[in-house]
UniProtKB/Swiss-Prot annotation:
It comes from Homo sapiens. One of its GO terms (cellular component) is centriolar satellite. This is YTH domain-containing family protein 2. It is found in: Cytoplasm, Cytosol; Cytoplasm, P-body; Cytoplasm, Stress granule; Nucleus. The gene is YTHDF2. Residues 410-544 form the YTH domain. Residues 359-371 have a biased composition (Gly residues). Induction: Following heat shock stress. It holds the Pfam family YTH. The lineage of its organism: Eukaryota, Metazoa, Chordata, Craniata, Vertebrata. The keyword Mitochondrion does not apply. Residues 291-316, 372-383 have a biased composition (Polar residues). Residues 1-45, 247-387 are annotated as: Disordered. The modification Phosphoserine is found at S2, S4, S5, S22, S39, S196, S359, S394. Changing R441A: Slightly decreased binding to RNAs. Changing W486A: Reduced binding to N6-methyladenosine (m6A)-containing RNAs. Reduced ability to undergo liquid-liquid phase separation.
Length: 579
């Protein structure tokens, strides 16, 4: 076949060019010079154009690659600028990836990414003898021509162009249908399942591999370093050596190494050790606080015994013994230092009398020596009543059984006290004083009755949860007199009273009685000097008179006597400093 006949048969869209340079009539070349390049196999595939035109359709989607081997003859560009030579990416063979390399930057990857007729991808600069003039034999780690043709194929992270990752030499036991480094990953996953660092150390390392075996090994060691890290310092030779060691040594080593040896979180046994040794590692101040709570709880447990004695035995003996035992109360003692400390240490949500405290309220120790005095009093004077209380009992008939609660004429008021100290002194001196507004209301009620009926006062301490007694108003209010015996000096005026009932009646016994003159609220939810209608007052008086009480302020009478003496001594000291 002659060159002229071939040129005449070319399509019109193609120029009179052949690969690797222009050919014209004037060059004087013979027809035989084109025989190696013009074979009959090129006729069925006339879709590709000259290789120098890298941006023609053959750059993107030619049907097939070259039909001849590059090893037949050396190439020449004919003086043209060196351009990369590309072939098609057609069918996949031998499991190689299908992608389009970047043609304009001369990557040393494969010339044709898809092999033809079972051959591997051709390298642009293979190190064979046919291309010895094009490059160095030691370039890009390609030692022999066989290795260049058999194992040098590229893997690109993207489907079109981009930076390519050089193909690596396959392992001895690695087939061509696996990407380089897959066996390394498989062995690394096996090492993770086994949970041992020995398998990771046997993983083969490939220099420059895209998936570095060193990183896998380090990850395996890091993931498995948590349990073995604690055993690494002793390094036993066999399992028998490990079994011969004490069982409790390894948790201790784990705890120390987990804290100071590494940055990893401590093993779960670390928390178990903390739970077991919480009492030893706790703050030192916690032990005194627990001891204080236990000491405070002791008089609380001792108080129910006098309660039982009061119910079964004679009231004076029981009341005296309880009065010696329970001594704390909310009103401030005369000593400011003790007051500030004790009130901060024990502030209940609701005030309850010390005798009725039980274990639910920790209002002990308003008096600095309350706990010690209660224990000493219970052992030293269990049967000796206070002389003042004995005198009061002899004069007054408290808690009478023949009380006439069915009133025909009379008025009843609720009295709310700030503290039981004032209740104690009201019983002791048979006097009372209310607020300025309360005094006017009580005085008007007393004067309105004019002896036609009694004026009863139902006493209750704020926040106590019970009524502590009933007294009868015996005189009008004297606004010009100041008693000077109350826990606070702000009260002015005074009137005489006579105490009839001295007992603790819980609010639960009276809560069902509602007052129509106070928004239909329970009688237990009343303010100071709140008047109770006569019919409702009869119900209240009946319940209080018939209620079988177990506690009263008489149980703490000795305690309040001592508090009063302390307050009087403090007042005298203040008066002496003021002079």
């Amino acid at each position: 076949m002659s060159a002229s006949s071939l040129l005449e048969q070319r399509p019109k869209g193609q120029g009179n060019k052949v690969q690797n340079g222009s050919v014209h009539q004037k060059d004087g070349l013979n027809d035989d010079d084109f025989e190696p390049y013009l074979s009959p196999q090129a006729r069925p595939n006339n879709a590709y154009t000259a290789m120098s035109d890298s941006y023609l359709p053959s750059y993107y989607s030619p049907s097939i690659g070259f039909s001849y081997s590059l090893g037949e003859a050396a190439w020449s560009t004919g003086g043209d600028t060196a351009m990369p030579y590309l072939t098609s990416y057609g069918q996949l063979s031998n499991g190689e990836p299908h992608f389009l390399p970047d043609a304009m930057f001369g990557q040393p990857g494969a010339l044709g990414s898809t092999p033809f007729l079972g051959q591997h991808g051709f390298n642009f600069f293979p190190s064979g003898i046919d291309f010895s003039a094009w490059g160095n034999n030691s370039s890009q780690g390609q030692s022999t021509q066989s290795s260049g043709y058999s194992s040098n194929y590229a893997y690109a992270p993207s489907s079109l162009g981009g930076a390519m990752i050089d193909g690596q030499s396959a392992f001895a036991n690695e087939t061509l249908n696996k990407a380089p480094g897959m066996n390394t990953i498989d062995q690394g996953m096996a090492a993770l399942k086994l949970g041992s660092t020995e398998v990771a150390s046997n993983v083969p390392k490939v220099v420059g591999s895209a998936v570095g075996s060193g990183s896998i090994t380090s990850n395996i060691v890091a993931s498995n370093s948590l349990p073995p890290a604690t055993i690494a310092p002793p390094k036993p030779a066999s399992w028998a050596d490990i079994a011969s060691k004490p069982a409790k040594q390894q948790p201790k080593l784990k705890t120390k190494n987990g804290i100071a040896g590494s940055s990893l979180p401590p093993p779960p046994i670390k928390h178990n050790m903390d739970i077991g040794t919480w009492d030893n590692k706790g703050p030192v101040a916690k032990a005194p606080s627990q001891a204080l709570v236990q000491n405070i709880g002791q008089p609380t447990q001792g108080s129910p015994q006098p309660v039982g004695q009061q119910a079964n035995n004679s009231p004076p003996v029981a009341q005296a013994s309880v009065g010696q035992q329970t001594q704390p109360l909310p009103p401030p003692p005369p000593q400011p230092a003790q007051l500030s400390v004790q009130q901060q240490a024990a502030q209940p949500t609701r005030w309850v009398a010390p005798r009725n405290r039980g274990s639910g309220f920790g209002h002990n120790g308003v008096d600095g020596n309350g706990v010690g005095q209660s224990q000493a009093g219970s052992g030293s004077t269990p049967s000796e009543p206070h002389p003042v209380l004995e005198k009061l009992r002899s004069i007054n008939n408290y808690n009478p059984k023949d009380f006439d609660w069915n009133l025909k004429h009379g008025r009843v008021f609720i009295i709310k006290s700030y503290s039981e100290d004032d209740i104690h002194r009201s019983i002791k001196y048979n006097i009372w004083c209310s607020t300025e507004h309360g005094n006017k209301r009580l005085d008007a009620a007393y004067r309105s009755m004019n002896g036609k009926g009694p004026v009863y006062l139902l006493f209750s301490v704020n926040g106590s949860g019970h009524f502590c007694g009933v007294a009868e108003m015996k005189s009008a209010v004297d606004y010009n007199t100041c008693a000077g015996v109350w826990s606070q000096d702000k009260w002015k005026g005074r009137f005489d009273v006579r105490w009839i009932f001295v007992k603790d009646v819980p609010n639960s016994q009276l809560r069902h009685i509602r007052l129509e003159n106070n928004e239909n609220k329970p009688v237990t939810n009343s303010r100071d000097t709140q008047e109770v209608p006569l019919e409702k007052a009869k119900q209240v008086l009946k319940i209080i008179a018939s209620y079988k009480h177990t506690t009263s302020i008489f149980d703490d009478f000795s305690h309040y006597e001592k508090r009063q003496e302390e307050e009087e001594s403090v007042k005298k000291e203040r008066q002496g400093r003021g002079k």
